[in-house]
Regions:
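Interaction-mediating elements
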Residues: 1-129
Length: 129
């Protein structure tokens, strides 16, 4: 279920978007139990950002979400790797990238609901994805 929305002020070619998706998937490996093939990514390019009192020319914002909570060092490694991927593909310096990380305890998908803190006795194994 890992989801990332990457909003970029720069425009990317389709090949660059694919490369960014692949590199973000590799960054996701820092989150225990997550693999690149699990990543859902929405890559928006050509966006206009205003921050620090002015329009930003090369800026990015990342909204990352995944199921469960992980230790600080894993989150930090993930964030640094994601920002490095953006810098490599889009040329946006990590100092011009802002990122939110949401750790979700409830997630629905593939026709089911998963909750980190609740197991319905009638749900089979109740395992989250």
């Amino acid at each position: 279920m890992p989801y990332m929305r990457v909003s970029l002020s720069v425009k990317l070619a389709e090949e660059q978007k694919q490369s960014l998706y692949e590199k973000l998937g590799e960054a996701l490996r820092h989150i225990p139990g997550k693999e690149p093939f699990m990543l859902m990514a929405d890559i928006e390019d050509g966006r206009q950002f205003y921050a620090y009192g002015k329009k930003q020319e090369n800026f990015a914002f990342v909204d990352a979400r995944y199921f469960s909570r992980v230790e600080y060092h894993a989150k930090k490694d993930f964030a640094v790797a994601a920002m490095k991927a953006i810098e490599e593909v889009a040329g946006t310096k990590s100092t011009n990238i802002s990122m939110n990380i949401f750790e979700l305890s409830t997630w629905a998908g593939f026709g089911d609901l998963n909750d980190e803190f609740y197991k319905d006795p009638g749900d089979g194994d109740g395992a989250g994805r």
